Amino acid sequence: MTNLLDGYPGHEHAIPIYPLYKDVIHTIAESRMIVTPTLIVSYGGPFAENYFWETEEPYHDAKLQHFMPYEELASKTRRVGAGWFMKEEQVFPKHAKSMKALVEANGLAGIGSHGEFQGMGYHWEMWAMQSGGMKNIDVLKVATILGATGLGLDKDLGSLEKGKLADLVILDKNPLENIRNTNTVHFVMKNGRLYDGNTCDEVYPAKKKLDRSEWNFEKPIRTTEVNE
């Protein structure tokens, strides 16, 4: 609260207290201080990333296997020493309830994946944000226009409007129906250039293959009959 009263424009990481009562929620909302809870590294309890390490299998994700060198992917996903926790020990759904209340009070919020695990971390953070009952449309707003507003970039980014930068993603499935459909990226448009979401090859306005020469380390070839 001292940050807020001193005029800080943003607060990163969750406020490690639950519940946040209406006086706190509405004060934050009316101050227009953006809160980026980074639930993936939740304060006050186990990190949300631990939950996703326990429940997801990122090693087998086709895109990660395509984009990440084998050594990098395997070292980060096959043996994770972050710890195992019973579901009821997780604190991030409680923090997510506070974020739901803040957004519904017209407050500013942002998505921050803290750089824990590239590619999937941002999706995990969105899924964690929804775990407290936030509407899927509000999660998407937090990931786009609300975050852009908090950074002062809403005149250029955050929504599809005439005059804004042509930065967007095209999905195969609707995240309004299931928030986990955020992880179905088919195309990415960056600054008016369209890229294949599975390969990062440019498909418009020119057709150009992604140069993987500096980091394309293949998975080792199996030379025995031993299965994983």
Regions found by a protein language model. Give the residues of each.
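Acidic, glycine-enriched loop/beta-strand segments at the rims
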Residues: 120, 135-140, 150-185
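Short aromatic-centered micro-motifs
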Residues: 188
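A short, polar/charged loop-to-alpha-helix boundary motif
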Residues: 180, 203-214
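Divalent metal-coordination and catalytic microenvironments
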Residues: 11, 35, 114, 129, ...
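Active-site neighborhoods of metal-dependent hydrolases
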Residues: 14-132, 137, 198, 205-207, ...
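Functional cores that coordinate and move charged inorganic groups
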Residues: 1-7
